From Swiss-Prot:
Protein name: Nitrogen regulatory protein P-II homolog
Functional note: Participates in sensing carbon and organic nitrogen status and regulates some steps of primary carbon and nitrogen metabolism.
Gene source species: Oryza sativa subsp. japonica (Rice)
Assembly and binders: Homodimer.
Organism domain of life: Eukaryota
List of residues binding Mg(2+): 119
Length: 212
């Protein structure tokens, strides 16, 4: 039986020198600490001012109640405008109640027009004075348009809802449209002075002043 030295000499005599290395042990999987250290070294080698931070925590999600509260706050946004046109689509037989309520507020400039249409809830039935109307056919409605100052918008909307609501499908809708300016044709007045033709805030303030 040959010794290790004899085997090495025999291999060298054949012109081939063989080195026997022990098998390499498997590397352990990288840990979170190892990965973080590598990222920190990479960030420093790139000359970053701040080391790269690794956050392994799951992303924070808002609870449903907080999300709804944020949506409600965003829904109250109104574009900046001095005047607004309040456009309401109403049942014809509710118009006298709405106009009477607006007159009590001092709103006199109202434009109404007869329109026809149906809502997105096609196929439902609207009842009035014992008769039924299918909402998939055009129904007679009244469009009421009022131009008021910004300070009066909420009061006018609340009054229309109070007088026009029945609680059934088909009560209508209200649209708020910003108005850039108001011009009186007869005199050429603009802005607050011309808004008096709509029974607006300027008209109410001037009528409330005592006559000396």
């Amino acid at each position: 039986m040959s010794s290790p030295a004899t085997a090495a000499a025999a291999a060298a005599s054949c012109g081939v020198l063989r080195h026997h290395h022990p098998p390499a042990s498997p590397r352990p999987p990288p840990t979170t600490t190892t990965t973080t250290s590598r990222l920190l070294l990479a960030s420093r080698s790139r000359g970053l001012q701040r080391p790269l931070r690794v956050n392994h925590a799951p992303p924070r999600r808002l609870p449903p109640t907080a999300a709804r509260a944020q949506s409600a706050a965003a829904a109250g946004y109104q574009p900046e405008s001095e005047f607004y046109k309040v456009e309401a689509i109403l049942r014809p037989w509710r118009v006298p109640y709405v106009s009477s309520g607006l007159l009590q507020m001092g709103i006199r400039g109202v434009t109404v027009s007869d329109v026809r249409g149906f809502g997105a809830q096609g196929g439902s039935t609207e009842r009035h004075e014992g008769s039924e109307f299918a909402e998939d056919t055009f129904i007679d409605k009244v469009k009421m348009e009022i131009v008021v100052s910004k300070d009066q918008v909420e009061a006018v909307v609340d009054k229309i809802i109070e007088k026009a609501r029945t609680g059934e499908i088909g009560d209508g809708k209200i649209f708020l449209i910003p108005v850039s300016d108001v011009i009186r044709i007869r005199t050429g007045e603009r802005g607050e002075r011309a808004e008096r033709m709509a029974g607006g805030l300027a008209d109410k303030l001037s009528s409330a002043m005592p006559i000396s």
